Amino acid sequence: MTPGLTVFIPVYNEEAILEQNAEKVLEYLARLGVAHELILGSNGSTDRTPEIGAELARKHGNVQFFHVPERGPGRAFARALRMARYDKFVTLDADLSFDMAFVADALAALEQNDAVIGSKGLGTQKRPLFRIIASDSFIWLTNLLLHMPYRDYAIGAKGYRTAAILPHADKVDAHTFYTQEMIYQVRRAGGRIAEIPVKCEDRRASRFNLLHEGFYRYGKLFGLWFRSLRD
């Protein structure tokens, strides 16, 4: 693939922040001195997000935008992965809760690794205590069942060599479990995975129903565990 960097942000009803945050990302990427693009993937948005995203794509030649009617960041992730022009693929959250320095750090780490995990556990995080406890419990069980040593499986602040995960695009969970799947598949294939510290600050309440998300992710985790027993 062409050397360079694709940054992907899944978006859902982000009319209040989409334009300004996309411009911030583009300004940051321009300072890195590498070929780059930004892909914005609206999934299920019912506000003006699709119109704003389409206008950003018209304004900037290095922005791609798409909208799918069904909500599901994993569904958007898979589509963005197929659209990516460059050999390195980094994911961010729409609210930019992670320090964007992760992008440059991931870009460097992907020279020697197939995946890069931005880890709040290794860095710093300003989040409600109940969210930290819930996340840590899920991470602990993930590592126990899948025999993995990592400390963060959130959607944002992750990086991949595009070629390492593109073969799995058709199997990506449509919703919020795809990070675990991608990391598991890279590790299973013998790929190299780096974990680096990130700074994270919650800028708003979660956009997901946390109780529903808990049941969903635990169900998906046990499903992946059962499949891993057959691998």
Give each language-model segment a name.
Residues 36-39, 50-83:
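Conserved donor nucleotide-binding strand/loop of the catalytic core
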Residues 92-94:
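Catalytic metal- and UDP-sugar-binding loop of GT-A-like glycosyltransferases, i.e.
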Residues 14-29:
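Short, well-formed alpha-helical segments that are part of the catalytic scaffolds
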Residues 68-83, 100-176, 203-212, 218-219:
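Acceptor/aglycone-binding surface of glycosyltransferases and processive sugar-polymer synthases
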Residues 14-17, 45, 73, 99:
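Donor nucleotide-sugar binding loop of glycosyltransferases
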Residues 42-50, 96:
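A conserved acidic beta->alpha catalytic loop
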Residues 1-4, 16, 20, 145-148, ...:
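Hydrophobic helical membrane-anchoring modules
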Residues 89:
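Short aromatic/hydrophobic "clamp" motif used to bind/position activated sugar donors
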